[in-house]
């Protein structure tokens, strides 16, 4: 067979594989793997000194090399800004209610915010993390594995009880395996965490809602407003999605079998506002990551971040930050 035929065959095969993946469980598998990317990028940025996290080393693969494109300073700055912004919103919320408040993290991946809060003596009533069972079971293994210099179990109020390999309950910390798109499965699993529906509760979705259809994420938000008396929501995801930047990103993700089913909600601040207001949230603030970087976050910290790896030009960073946003919504 000549080389052209081989290459066109492999093109066809790749296209068929992508189409198959997009409508099957392997689509979910590819989405779950985005957690590995986020963890490795955060681990890389932390090692560079962008921020301090004593816990991520338990979850990251310290021997894996981060792809060159993910080692650009712009990428590390973006990860720093998103982590810092979410942490600031959550800490502010917990302080506002003197710790008598709960945190629920949807699509938590290997996020370490629970440990960062507890180790800094932040007060909270309950912390619940949710992800696909295949992700939570891995997270549980990392939490419980012996050895290492940091013992994650030390942060728990009581001994960890694991069920079905995918759920862990330990005092005020809970990690549960559930598909956020499956309403009754999610509600059943959340019920095992005995959340108090009457106290203030902040929900986090860091790069998660975009993987679900707009209808599904909208009904998830509506359910929260109807079930919790004082919910707040901090959402980080793509933004300004109708230009070439997003098309290239979509194409790259598509080649890895990842579809962004909820991208239409990320088009503009108006779309985000509409989604949260329709779900019953009364106040909705949308900031793109340039605003987060230059106004919302501590400017001494921003100055320190800028020194770590000096950029020759700001255009790429500004372009990247313009395509992500944080939404903070309250009832
Ligand atoms: C890009 S990763 C982000 C992980 C973490 N929030 C962070 O920012 O480091 C997306 C996460 O959302 C989870 N996720 C996406 N769709 C989900 C669903 N329908 N149900 C449960 N988890 C989901 C994935 O498994 C993955 O862990």
Curated annotation (Swiss-Prot):
Keywords: Methyltransferase, S-adenosyl-L-methionine, Transferase. It is an enzyme of class 2 (transferase). S-adenosyl-L-methionine binds at residues 82, 107, 131, 179-180, 206. InterPro entries: LCMT1, Ppm1/Ppm2/Tcmp, SAM-dependent_MTases_sf. Signal peptide: none annotated. One of its GO terms (molecular function) is protein C-terminal leucine carboxyl O-methyltransferase activity. GO terms for biological process: methylation; regulation of mitotic cell cycle spindle assembly checkpoint. It comes from the Eukaryota. Its EC number is 2.1.1.233. It catalyses: [phosphatase 2A protein]-C-terminal L-leucine + S-adenosyl-L-methionine = [phosphatase 2A protein]-C-terminal L-leucine methyl ester + S-adenosyl-L-homocysteine. GO terms for cellular component: cytosol. SUPFAM superfamilies: S-adenosyl-L-methionine-dependent methyltransferases. The keyword Transferase applies. Methylates the carboxyl group of the C-terminal leucine residue of protein phosphatase 2A catalytic subunits to form alpha-leucine ester residues. This is Probable leucine carboxyl methyltransferase 1. The gene is lcmt-1.
């Amino acid at each position: 067979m000549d080389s052209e035929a081989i290459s066109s065959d492999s093109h066809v095969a790749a296209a068929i594989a992508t189409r198959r993946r997009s409508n099957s469980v392997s689509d979910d598998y590819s989405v779950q793997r985005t957690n590995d990317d986020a963890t490795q990028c955060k681990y890389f940025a932390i090692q560079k000194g962008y921020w301090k996290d004593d816990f991520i080393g338990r979850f990251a693969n310290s021997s894996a090399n981060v792809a060159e494109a993910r080692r650009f300073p712009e990428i590390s700055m973006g990860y720093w800004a998103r982590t810092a912004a979410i942490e600031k919103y959550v800490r502010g919320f917990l302080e506002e209610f003197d710790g008598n408040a709960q945190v629920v993290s949807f699509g938590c991946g290997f996020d370490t915010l629970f440990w960062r809060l507890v180790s800094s003596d932040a007060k909270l009533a309950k912390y619940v993390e949710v992800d696909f069972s295949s992700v939570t079971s891995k997270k549980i293994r990392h939490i419980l594995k012996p050895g290492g210099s940091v013992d994650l179990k030390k942060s728990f109020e009581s001994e960890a009880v694991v069920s079905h390999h995918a759920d862990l309950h330990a005092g005020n910390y809970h990690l549960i395996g559930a598909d956020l798109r499956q309403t009754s499965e999610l509600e059943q699993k959340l019920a095992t965490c005995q959340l108090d529906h009457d106290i203030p509760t902040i929900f986090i979705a860091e790069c998660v809602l975009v993987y679900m259809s707009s209808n599904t994420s909208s009904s998830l938000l509506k359910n929260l407003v109807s079930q919790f008396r004082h919910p707040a929501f901090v959402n980080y995801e793509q933004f300004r999605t109708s230009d070439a930047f997003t098309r290239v990103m979509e194409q790259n993700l598509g080649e890895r079998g990842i579809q962004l089913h909820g991208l239409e909600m990320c088009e503009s601040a108006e779309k985000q506002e509409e989604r949260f207001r329709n779900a019953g949230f009364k106040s909705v603030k949308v900031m793109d990551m340039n605003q987060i970087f230059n106004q919302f976050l501590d400017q001494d910290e921003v100055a320190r971040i800028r020194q770590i790896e000096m950029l020759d030009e700001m255009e790429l960073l500004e372009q990247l930050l313009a395509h992500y946003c944080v939404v903070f919504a309250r009832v």
